[in-house]
Design a protein with these regions (language model features):
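Short aromatic-glycine-(Arg/Gly/Cys) micro-motifs in beta-strand/loop hairpins
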Residues: 1-19
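A broad, low-specificity signal marking well-ordered, structured residues that form hydrophobic/aromatic
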Residues: 5, 23, 108
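Short, well-ordered alpha-helical segments
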Residues: 35-38
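Short, mixed-charge low-complexity intrinsically disordered segments
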Residues: 41-121
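Residue-level detector of functional hotspots within protein domains
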Residues: 9-11, 25, 83
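A short, exposed loop/beta-hairpin motif centered on an aromatic-Gly-Thr core
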Residues: 16-33
Length: 121
């Protein structure tokens, strides 16, 4: 089995932090695919329940402006951004992409990283 990768979507509002969901998958391409799917779900859902949601999908977020959803959609569909993202993961770095809804001070971060197996003590 290839080295596992993890991906997570988090939200920060003021001083509160929450994980909206995450996965551990067998390779970086699957991690990026999951992050792209979540970015599009969040952008297109705009806080409402999405019909094609699967158990591994993140909880919806209600944005108060259109900039954050548009940024998520652009990141998920732009070939150059996706090439940069996969190269970041290939190089062993953590991938971070954050969008902000300034109307309410909401930050949504998509992150992916190499999840090293635990070393025995």
């Amino acid at each position: 089995m290839r080295a596992p990768y993890a991906a997570e979507v988090t939200v920060i509002v003021g001083q509160r932090f929450a994980s909206l969901g995450g996965v551990t998958v067998r390779n970086r391409r699957l991690a990026l695919l999951w992050l792209r799917r979540q970015a599009l779900r969040l952008a297109n859902g705009h806080g409402s329940a999405v019909r094609d949601a699967s158990p591994g999908d993140v909880r919806p977020v209600r944005f108060h402006g259109t900039d954050a959803p548009e940024s998520l959609r652009f990141w998920a569909t732009d070939a150059h951004r996706q090439d940069d993202a996969i190269r970041t993961l290939e190089a062993g770095f953590t991938l971070h992409f954050t969008v902000t809804d300034p109307a309410v001070g909401l930050d949504v971060t998509l992150a992916g990283w190499h999840a090293s197996p635990a070393t025995p003590l």
